[in-house]
Amino acid sequence: MHVPQTILDQPLTLPNGAVVKNRLLKSAMSETLGTREGAPTPALNRLYRAWAEGGIGLCVTGNVMVDLRALGEPGNVVIEDAAHLAALQAWAKAGTANGTQCWVQLNHPGKQAPRGLNHETVAPSAVPFRDDLKAFFATPRALTGAEVRALVARFGKAAGIVKQAGFTGVQIHGAHGYLVSQFLSPHHNLRTDEWGGSPEKRRRFLMEVYRAIRKATGAGFPIGIKLNSADFQRGGFTEEESLDTIRALAHAGIDLIEISGGTYESPAMTGVKSGREPARESTRQR
């Protein structure tokens, strides 16, 4: 008996020619199973091997940071250099079993790091959290221009190590109010230099991160992004700006775009826009 192939079973060919064996994607989650030094662990290997052997086409790792001084939560894996290359290779081997694409999501929390976890928090601008969150999150220090450029380089260097370890792609975390998302947002980014102001200048950090990763990994290595459809926050990143950003990324050669929404102050990704206002049904379904 012939069983018709569903669209979920069909391979997906990305713009750079890489093929995902089916349309099933495990989106990034923050497993917090890294060591104190930021290395992946056997627990992560077991988890990702189980997902790979389950038949998923693309598995995206959760919340891998590019700076040990800037953790989003305890237990984050961190890639600053090749110090943990052997552990990363073991993780990649597990995650790419069974013909699975396994991509590393690279991130920097910016201001969204709990008090006491890091020496200080940094962001595009020194914009405090709203009053009911100030007990949990400190007001960040605004990054200098030199620090912004250094962070771009960190993303590129981390991506090169990801490829060296044997992972098959990278995803930029550009959603949920983390650093890339903060640069995109007119609420969080009040800069008047080349990194802020107009929508084009606010997305410059993202575009430079993308270019640094592409330079470090080459044309054949898939690069994706997790991007907010909107921040769902007054004065934040809008749907129109999101569409313009998608067009800019598509023109630059991005391979895959995953849409989400919200920030810690307006957590639409959890089904709630704010502490009092439910998100739309379409957001909850995402």
Language-model features: where?
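Flavin-dependent oxidoreductase catalytic cores
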Residues: M1-R286
